């Protein structure tokens, strides 16, 4: 693996991506970028509290910069409303829990919505 942490720390744009989705070269691929992010930040050792809040950029904003599509990427007036909604309250929770997608929006229209998972019972492990 290249020196992702060092490149990122020095202001060089770094992004994570996946080009194989359940094919002969990578049968485990499923297009889940949270899995790719999880692997990448573990291997690159980018898990400090300061890094974690920015790690989502590695699979979102930084990819848009690399692909030179920032003129129509992001949540800003005048740009198409293309985004996903994760089942998490924070960046840390999204990464730690590999948050599921609860909605996907393209050009301002919902492609799908689903009810987030709910825990109906709990065990107090401290007893």
What positions do the PLM features span?
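His/Asp/Glu-enriched, well-ordered alpha-helical/loop segment
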Residues: 2-85
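C-terminal cap of metal-dependent C-N hydrolases
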Residues: 77-127
């Amino acid at each position: 693996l290249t020196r992702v942490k060092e490149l990122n720390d020095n202001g060089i744009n770094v992004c994570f991506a996946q080009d194989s989705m359940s094919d002969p070269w990578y049968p485990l691929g499923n297009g889940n970028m949270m899995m790719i992010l999880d692997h990448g930040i573990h291997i690159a050792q980018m898990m400090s509290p300061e890094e974690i809040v920015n790690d989502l950029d590695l699979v979102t904003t930084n990819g848009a910069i690399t692909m030179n599509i920032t003129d129509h990427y992001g949540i800003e007036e005048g740009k198409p409303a293309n985004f996903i909604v994760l089942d998490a309250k924070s960046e840390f929770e999204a990464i730690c829990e590999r948050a599921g997608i609860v909605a996907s929006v393209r050009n301002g229209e919902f492609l799908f919505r689903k009810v987030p998972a709910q825990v109906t019972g709990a065990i107090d492990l401290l007893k």
